[in-house]
Amino acid sequence: MKIFGIIMETNPLHNGHSYFIKKIKEIYQPDVLIAITSTSFTMRGDISVIDKFTKTDQLLDAGIDIILELPFTLALQSADYFAKNAIEILNGIKITDLVFGSEIDNYEFYDKCLNIINNFNNYDNKFSKKQ
């Protein structure tokens, strides 16, 4: 059984989100598509333009099968912790695949960014020393 998880920050749901959900279903044909999303507050701490109940209805209408709420205390984090917390919850319910969108379709770019993050102390020391 293919159980796909997706982390969604919809404030509100727009055509890009709907297109992404549609493409996931067309291309991968998961048996279940589960979304985890923030509450009535966004990751940035803003009040969402729609409440979590309307957000849930919109996601169901867009084709999501199950919607999980990322608890407020886990959602109000930097993007990396927001994602980490959401992934931990999705892993806890045994998803088989995690799908996500990207504004840049160049894997090498993300690989280089990850390398910089993983080696930040080396970069920090290199650039912080006086020449």
Please report, for each region that a protein language model flagged, where it lies by residue.
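Nucleotidyltransferase catalytic core that binds NTPs
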Residues: M1-Q131
